[in-house]
Design a protein with these regions (language model features):
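Gly/Ser/Thr-rich beta-alpha loop segments that engage phosphate groups in nucleotides
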Residues: 40, 93, 114, 127, ...
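Acidic loop->beta-strand submotif enriched in PP2C/PPM serine/threonine phosphatases
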Residues: 94-105
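Active-site loop architecture of trypsin-fold serine endopeptidases
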Residues: 118-123
Length: 151
């Protein structure tokens, strides 16, 4: 009985190690979950939508592009993550209602799809590239809205 017990414990430990070796790199470097909070991206996303964020593309393949939905660390409080759409690229000048923003070489202009109720670059200015975590890739929840997110 004692050897069966330890054999069972060893199987659990092996399973845990395999999970760590496979899941942790994926979670840290390739993709991560994100739950939408608030209404700034309505009608595209609603509060409570569960997304998978692609962290690989912007780190190894290419830079963000106009129209892509990204998740990033809020510049005024990096412990918070926001989701917005890229509306301006590095080096561009953005003019909205007579107010102008000149973007630096590593700055992006982001806005929520719900323009009237979004805290975004219009409020706090350009988003530094270093704050971008990744792009929205897949919506998993709610099940009725399960979809790949076109860019």
């Amino acid at each position: 009985m004692n050897s069966k017990f330890w054999l069972g414990v060893w199987e659990i430990v092996k399973f845990g190690l395999i999970v760590l070796v496979i899941v942790m790199p994926i979670r840290l470097y390739i993709a991560q979950p994100f739950i939408v909070s608030g209404d700034s991206m309505v009608p595209t996303f609603h509060s409570g939508d569960y997304l998978i964020i692609d962290e690989l593309t912007y780190n190894f393949v290419r830079e963000p592009e106009i129209g892509e939905v990204i998740v990033f660390r809020y510049p005024e409080d990096p412990s918070k993550f926001f989701i917005k759409r890229i509306e301006g690229l590095p080096g561009e000048t953005i003019d909205i209602g007579g107010k102008e923003w000149n973007l630096g070489e590593d700055e992006y202009f982001v806005m929520g799809d719900n323009r009237l109720f979004s805290l975004d670059s219009r409020s706090w200015g350009p988003l530094p590239r270093k704050n971008i975590t990744g792009r929205a890739l897949v919506r998993l929840w709610p099940p009725t809205a399960l979809a790949y997110i076109p860019q």
